[in-house]
């Protein structure tokens, strides 16, 4: 998106229009600006500045109002060239801490932690919050255990990167003793521990080729490697919260907007696509982290054209997850960026 240079006066007026529209959800007129902001400009002068901003595509006039509202281009200019993001303050941190304390979750269970983070971010931001767990292809395999369920079934339990546990039930086509199971567990842990799941998928046959003992059971494990050591399915990686908050915003007075939101929430693959697509990056000076912001038609999904998506990565060892919020373009960008950035930092520490 190309911008032409705005004068300081134009930048001031654009910034005020965006801030006032975010606060009041009503189109902003020149008289409102003249009365409420000490710019030292007359109503007529402000009106001329607004006309120039409209001609340049930064604001537009709804059919039913004399005021103006920001366009996608206006929001983008504001986010890229005007907005300054400060670090999160103690009051906000205390609110987040209180929200976490009110939730009942297991601090040792990664799925519980991610769901709790989504709930807190949704509640604090009043937007739809989404947390995506890391893809596990680059996660380190730590340990495998086999649990006998019956004479013909075993449960394979994988411990990954200290935090993630995967369980898969396998049908046995042969009888095995406890000693055979223990032998296979020891061998697999010895040969595979410390490798990434991708490395295991690509090399497990070769790594176990010289093992003749308990070969039938080993062959079953090797034959199931693509499922055992695969990435977590999308549906299991996605944690969504905050729908009850976002629908209270004025934008959702229109039933079609609610339907669009529901469609997005139900399409898990599209939701992951929205969050994992890198938008324009906004550096957050206070933390050194980058927050990605996609506004309106910058989003890949047509149902997301009236929304902004703000996301950032979080880190678990050498794996990367992503969290963020989805809300109307009329959002408090500085605050949302601060919250998303802080929650990612907190999540990285909680899962490390």
UniProtKB/Swiss-Prot annotation:
One of its GO terms (biological process) is negative regulation of DNA-templated transcription. It comes from Chlorobium phaeobacteroides (strain BS1). One of its GO terms (molecular function) is DNA binding. Negative regulator of class I heat shock genes (grpE-dnaK-dnaJ and groELS operons). Prevents heat-shock induction of these operons. Disulfide bonds: none annotated. Gene3D superfamilies: 3.30.450.40, Heat-inducible transcription repressor hrca homolog, domain 3, Winged helix-like DNA-binding domain superfamily/Winged helix DNA-binding domain. InterPro entries: GAF-like_dom_sf (IPR029016), HrcA (IPR002571), HrcA_C (IPR021153), WH-like_DNA-bd_sf (IPR036388), WH_DNA-bd_sf (IPR036390), WHTH_transcript_rep_HrcA_IDD (IPR023120). This is Heat-inducible transcription repressor HrcA. Keywords: Repressor, Stress response, Transcription, Transcription regulation. Belongs to the HrcA family. The keyword Transcription applies.
